[in-house]
Amino acid sequence: MISPSSPFERWQALAAGLYMSIVGYSVLAGIPVISTAWSSLLSFSEPQVGRVAGADLGGLSFGAVLAALFVAKMNRRVLVVLSVLGAVATNIACTLYQSYEATLLLRFLAGTASGVFTGIAVATLGARVNSARAFNYLVFAFAFVQAAERYWLPRMSMNTIYLVFAISYLPALFILSWVPATGIRSGNAVAPSTEAELGAGDSFSSARIEAVAGQEFSERAGVVAVPTVDTSVVPKSVPWLCLSAMALTYVNIGAYWTYIELASADAALDADWVSNVLVWVSFFALIGCLVATLISDRFGLAKPLLLTLLIHALIVAILVPGMDKTRFFACVYEFNFLWIFNDV
């Protein structure tokens, strides 16, 4: 349970978490146009583009795992500084070494630094009492950043794109004090009077003490208490199955955004029209965010999510017979809508 005086509840922590999350996810947001840049400006083949994109996004995942391992053991501000230095250095190195082999390695390292950076940002947002609202802010802002990237990046050289990514990390150093240095200790969840009231020799367990303290805080802060769930009835394999399903889902999403613009070029669709569609489709994510919130409030999470994943697969399947303007338009709009729907 989070103390009302928690540093994570300050607006500065919210602002830092949102900015860092947006910067950390910037490559993912712009991957369709970045993939095209690797192909057209660096003359990478389509398989090479896929491997470079996979290295970048794979590094993002690896970095997030590293952040999860060290976030409770190290000062978070130190992790932010290290990740900023790594991201800036590797993006600048990409402007100097542009062979396929060098780019493959450097994009993995850049993705890893970005993953640590983003992991700290997400942990900062997730530690708030109303973390759902914080992530809704993130999804809302992400739509505008995604649109901006898809509009401006195609107008830049490859080196300029790398430099923009490098520079975007630097403001985090100026707002470093806004990032809480440590997480919330579990001991802080117990109200000072709770243990004394129960008595030192009381038969209540520590879990019961935390439950009572949590109820007291909920009543004081106006937070609706959530009934305790008996996790012993959930098989240990279920969380791992859920994580595996999430990983596979995002591998497919990453692959889609990596190749969709390249596929449109192979289908001889007008490049300017495709670019405009990719820009405006970003704003469709806002509708996805709103609809997902309304549906989840009414019908819960599991059934809408399962149905959405099935529709997601069917939407991509409409491109199997071939790609024309109508199919491309319908596919990218529905895909982006459902992608954000799944996130929410």
Predicted features along the sequence, with ranges:
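Structural signature of the two symmetry-related core transmembrane helices
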Residues: 78-92, 303-318
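Paired small-residue
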Residues: 101-110, 326-335
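Helix-loop-helix hairpin linking two adjacent transmembrane segments in secondary transporters
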Residues: 137-184
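Helix-breaking motifs and short loop linkers at transmembrane-helix boundaries and internal kinks
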Residues: 43, 96-101, 300, 321-323
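Cytoplasmic helix-loop-helix junction between adjacent transmembrane helices
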Residues: 106-140
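Extracytoplasmic gate region of multi-pass secondary transporters
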Residues: 31-32, 237-279
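Helix-to-loop junctions at the C-terminal end of transmembrane segments
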Residues: 63-76, 288-301
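Transmembrane alpha-helical segments of major facilitator superfamily
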Residues: 51-60, 275-285, 335
